[in-house]
UniProtKB/Swiss-Prot annotation:
Stored InterPro entries: MATalpha_HMGbox (IPR006856)
Gene Ontology cellular component terms for the protein in this record: nucleus
Gene: MTA-1
Function: Required for expression of the heterokaryon incompatibility and sexual functions.
Protein name, per record: Mating type protein A-1
Main location: nucleus
Cellular localisation: Nucleus
Length: 286
């Protein structure tokens, strides 16, 4: 007798009540947990996406087919790519927490623009010499009448510092503690010092020549963080990136010496920060 036949015979010999109880027992044994679907990871926001979101209203009177090429042109000649990428790297890492409290990308940009030296929307066209002109056929074009010098006064800043400044400016976040914990994680907090030219290149394009690219991981309460926070203004050639949107090749003995000195004195008080400008052989600027 096959196993199936044996099971059928066994059930046939049971009373109706026992048969129902056995069926319930079998049903419980065969029940499986529902498959939990993990939400798909959202695509990281890049610099151009946020740039377009912020400045697109400059051309709100134009149809989309005209507006999009103009945004591409402005982005190609914008000197603040690294600031936009830095902001987006921070946003992408804390996006889940921000969206839980209805903080949109547009709202995040609104509160962070003032802290990164980026030109505000209303002043953008005039600041970079752009004019929107109407052609005889009724279409529009961008005309550039000036190529200004661009100075980057970005103070050394990490993701936690940027987020804190946004909170101080009024970013509406009822529970900032999970974000602070995320940005305080030393495995996330990466500081890159780089050097790039101060002048925006010609209409044909622009090139950033990084002379120094060294990354280092530090907890936010490390002496490095204290030193960075204590500098009021490094020379304009120094700026900071954070995140995983790119890497730079290069080596600087001066910067390596600086890091070694700080690491050797890792227990230094935050009230006695290491003089980074002195370590790098550059003057402090008050």
């Amino acid at each position: 007798m096959s196993c199936v036949d044996q099971i059928v015979k066994t059930f046939a010999d049971l009373t109706e009540g026992d048969r129902e109880a056995a069926m319930r027992a079998f049903s419980m044994m065969m029940r499986t947990e529902p498959v939990r679907q993990t939400p798909a990871a959202k695509k990281k926001v890049n610099g151009f996406m946020s740039f377009r979101s912020y400045y697109s209203p400059l051309f709100s009177q134009l149809p989309q087919k005209e507006r999009s090429p103009f945004m591409t042109i402005l982005w190609q000649h914008d000197p603040f790519h690294n600031e936009w990428n830095f902001m987006c790297s921070v946003y992408s890492s804390i996006r889940t927490y921000l969206e839980q409290e209805k903080v949109t990308l547009q709202l995040w940009i609104h509160y962070r623009v003032r802290h990164l030296g980026v030109i505000i929307r209303d002043n953008y066209m005039a600041s970079f010499g752009w004019n929107l002109v109407q052609l005889p056929n009724g279409t529009h074009d961008l005309e550039r009448t000036a190529l200004p010098l661009v100075q980057h006064n970005l103070q050394p800043m990490n993701g936690l510092c940027l987020f804190t400044k946004c909170l101080e400016s009024g970013l509406p976040l009822a529970n900032p503690h999970p974000v602070i914990a995320k940005l305080s994680d030393p495995s996330y907090d990466m500081i890159w010092f780089n050097k790039r030219p101060h002048r925006q290149q010609g209409h044909a394009g622009q090139t950033y020549n990084s002379e120094l690219g060294v990354s280092a991981l530090f907890p936010c309460n490390h002496a490095v963080a204290a030193a960075v926070d204590g500098i009021t203004d490094l020379p304009l050639s120094h700026w900071l990136q954070q995140g995983d949107f790119g890497t730079e090749a290069g080596f600087s003995p001066q910067f390596e010496t600086l890091l070694d000195s700080i690491l050797e004195n890792g227990n230094a008080s935050i009230n006695d920060p290491y003089n980074m400008a002195l370590g790098m052989g550059v003057p402090m600027m008050g």
